[in-house]
From Swiss-Prot:
This is tRNA (guanine-N(1)-)-methyltransferase. It is found in: Cytoplasm. One of its GO terms (cellular component) is cytosol. It is an enzyme of class 2 (transferase). Its EC number is 2.1.1.228. GO terms for biological process: tRNA N1-guanine methylation. Keywords: Cytoplasm, Methyltransferase, S-adenosyl-L-methionine, Transferase, tRNA processing. Belongs to the RNA methyltransferase TrmD family. It comes from the Bacteria. It catalyses: guanosine(37) in tRNA + S-adenosyl-L-methionine = N(1)-methylguanosine(37) in tRNA + S-adenosyl-L-homocysteine + H(+). The keyword tRNA processing applies. Specifically methylates guanosine-37 in various tRNAs. The keyword ATP-binding does not apply.
Length: 252
């Protein structure tokens, strides 16, 4: 899968050469193409922005320069063009899975006051936001998208089961994880791993993990439960857990 990133700060993407994504690029499963927007400026000062029509603070990225950068990147081929924007739809795991189905995704990183709307109308397939907050540019959100989508590309993760068991893949938050030592003491306090995980009973372990995922989601992200594929037994379990939590809160 190929990612092309249109940005004024390509040096910010160096971390994508490390760890799993770096190995994915070396193996040829991922291709990361960084495009410096300023290379397509037409004046000697390499200006890529201008003041907004109608007045107001800040600068706006110019549509003609962005269009030249995009066309040079595509070279006549097609791609799914995404603009990272606070006005975009919320990026989530389902979106990551969908984007992984494209052979080539172009990510435009905005700066300053944003991008001329005419470029969006002419070239952008969708706008995505990573949350209800404002950053100095679209580079960090673009890195998040590349990371999340790359995990869905076959062969990038060494263990496909790891991606399938991630939070949100099943519609729920992930269950707690434990490793050695089984018994840990810190500052005089004793912390033990759950006995069921040490039992070797795979059925009991799977049941415990599912129950913990349900409980964690109920406590931290109850909004997800309405979308998760749950059995009748799990729905009744959630109702019982909710009653127990309400009773516990009322005690305090």
């Amino acid at each position: 899968m190929r990612f092309s990133i249109l940005t004024l700060f390509p040096e910010m993407f160096a971390p994508l050469q490390a760890s799993i994504l770096g190995r994915g690029q070396k193996s040829g499963r991922l291709d990361l193409n960084l495009v410096q927007i300023r290379d397509f400026a037409t004046d000697r000062h390499q200006n890529v922005d201008d003041t907004p029509f109608g007045g107001g603070p800040g600068m706006v990225l110019k549509p003609d320069i962005l269009s030249h950068a995009l066309r040079a990147t595509l070279q006549g081929e097609t791609a799914h063009v995404v603009y990272m924007s606070p006005q975009g739809s919320r990026f989530d795991q389902a979106t990551a899975q969908r984007l992984a189905g494209y052979g080539h995704v172009v990510l435009l990183c905005g700066r300053y006051e944003g991008v001329d709307e005419r470029f969006i109308d002419a070239h952008v397939d969708e706008e995505l936001s990573v949350g209800d907050f404002v950053l100095t540019g679209g580079e960090l959100p673009a890195m998040m998208v590349v990371d999340a989508v790359s995990r869905m590309v076959p062969g990038v993760l060494g263990d496909l089961e790891s991606a399938q068991a991630d939070s949100f893949q099943t519609g729920l938050l992930d269950h707690p994880h434990y490793t050695r030592p089984a018994h840990w003491v810190v500052d005089g306090d004793h912390y033990g791993a759950p006995e069921v995980l040490l039992s070797g009973n795979h059925g009991a372990i799977a049941e415990w993990r599912r129950r913990q995922a349900l409980l964690r989601t109920l406590i931290r992200r109850p909004d997800l439960l309405g979308k998760a594929p749950l059995s009748r037994v799990e729905k009744r379990l959630i109702e019982a857990l909710a009653v127990d939590l309400d009773a516990l809160e009322n005690k305090h």
